[in-house]
Amino acid sequence: PSTVEDSISVASINNKIITTEVFEVKGLEGNADVDNGKFDYSKSATDTDFEKGKEYEYVAVGLGKEEDFKDLDLTGKLALIQRGEIPFTEKIANALHHGAVGALVYNNVEGSNLGMAIDGDAKKIPSVFISKRYGEALKTGSYKVVFNNTMANRPSPEADQLSDFSSWGVTTDGQLKPDVTAPGGNIFSSLNDNTYGD
């Protein structure tokens, strides 16, 4: 129906900001270069979650290969792992087998956070994916990480781009459609069952 000449069809563009969960990094609260220590992330589907309010220590373990854990004590700590070379599942399982209680996987290139598809032993501990910038900031210091289910607004890397679910182009009779665009992607709003999401 929206391709009829006399209709006005509306395309969806992505919002300028995204509302996302963040964890806090104790010691980086005043550092504007890394969002004042509030790091956004994408969470993996795991059997457990990070303990709310607990201050976690972490250990940088390179790419998370078996040999990267040599002589490192991860007991009760998080593993800070760089993306690359081996699958996410293997990295996180290696961390678990060396005593880690969770994993922070950071990107090896600039860009949006990825969703990590993991299975097996890797699902036994909580894990999140963070940006290269955040990972490198953690790697260069010794901070504490706290998960408090806090939300924050961030600039969207896909701002003002057509949403992937929105159609656009030329109709079969050569008309340009849609006629106008409006924000419709990455809109944080109320959902069923007293929840929020986008």
For every predicted segment, state its role.
Residues 194-198:
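Short pre-catalytic strand/loop immediately N-terminal to key active-site residues, enriched for Gly-Thr
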Residues 1-178, 182, 192:
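Structured lumen-facing ectodomains of secretory-pathway proteins
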